[in-house]
Amino acid sequence: KPILVLGDPGQLPPIKGEGAFTKDAPDVMLTEIHRQAEESAIIRLATMARQGEPIGFGQYDTFVWKMRKMDVTPEQCLRGGQVICGLNATRLQLNNAMRRAAGFSDGWLPTGRGEKIICLKNQNDLGLINGMFVTLEDVVDEGSLYFSATVTDEEGNPIGRPGAEGNHQRLRIYKGHFEDHVAFDRHRHDRDWKEKRILTEATFGWAITGHKAQGSSWQNVIVWDDGL
């Protein structure tokens, strides 16, 4: 049977390889944008960026500015909504700076409520979805590979299997993604793959990459241009 394939030429390419259909020429291309106002600076600047056109510094409308990095402090980033960058190396640096600005400077493990944590792996049996933000409380270091914590979603609903006393069981969370913020090891995840299969995976979410941000929305964002 014929298959109708829809694609978005403005979507970020996969981290590895090519998109399944994007290497082929489309039969039809939709070019007129209806989702946002035609005069939206977001649409205009996004189109310029995709076409490789330079975007100067300054204010483009009531909602959009391009600022120099030296003019934006970690404290301002904390008040600016979600920070989005291109590279993982940038993400690690921004997370460290924003954690310090928020007062979480002791060690690389999350300390509990107030930390911005993002889930990195689907666990349908627990109600965890890759990309969702969660809150950790009562964090306990359990050894070399993981720590445990009670976990709630953004609405405050508990996450985990119900326990015998009516409360929800603590989750065991893989340390590696947090430890990468102070001692990056490119072989860590290959080395730990077998053990971490049964662990929850999460990391600091003060700053996230554009790939991780796809499909989400925020009231305000700061896009950190790192040349990706």
Question: For each predicted feature, which ranges?
Answer:
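C-terminal accessory regions
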Residues: F147-L228
